[in-house]
Amino acid sequence: MRWQGSSRRKATGGKIIAARGKRKFEMGRESAETRISDVKRKNVHTMGGNRKVRLLQSNVANITNPKDGKTVTATIETVIDNTANKHYVRRNILTKGSVIRTPVGTARVTSRPGQDGVINAVLIE
């Protein structure tokens, strides 16, 4: 779990004395770490009675060609580069900004698979 409350340190590095402890609503969740495999989704209930779709596994992506604006669904072969974490390349984990290899060509992921429940990508040269 990840705590998403405000920092206990000032900009100068000094400590802020907390007036209260941590609260449950400040708590985050584990990241989805979307892998390349058959499609597997999970619904998560969020604050306000809303819902998020976590994409746990997927082997397809909606790839848009920026030159002609056409979108095609293609299978994902592998992850080439990931700026979020260099170890995600070896584990084939998809995040926003990761570069993937597909039969259509090399593409950069533009959606957040763990938040949106779908993989959208743009072809790169």
From Swiss-Prot:
Keyword list (alphabetical) reads: Ribonucleoprotein, Ribosomal protein
Pfam short name (any one): Ribosomal_S8e
Decide whether keyword Transcription regulation is in the record: no
Q: Which GO terms describe its cellular component?
A: ribonucleoprotein complex; ribosome
This protein's source sits in the domain of life called: Archaea
**Biological process according to GO:** translation
Entry keyword Lipid biosynthesis: no
Molecular-function GO terms, alphabetical: structural constituent of ribosome
Q: Which NCBIfam families match?
A: eS8 (TIGR00307)
Sorted alphabetically, which HAMAP family does this protein's record hold?
Ribosomal_eS8 (MF_00029)
Q: Which PANTHER family match?
A: 40S RIBOSOMAL PROTEIN S8
Quote the subunit structure annotation: Part of the 30S ribosomal subunit.
The text of the family note is: Belongs to the eukaryotic ribosomal protein eS8 family.
- Descriptive protein name: Small ribosomal subunit protein eS8
Q: Organism classification, top ranks?
A: Archaea, Methanobacteriati, Methanobacteriota, Stenosarchaea group, Methanomicrobia
In the UniProt record, the gene name given for this protein reads rps8e
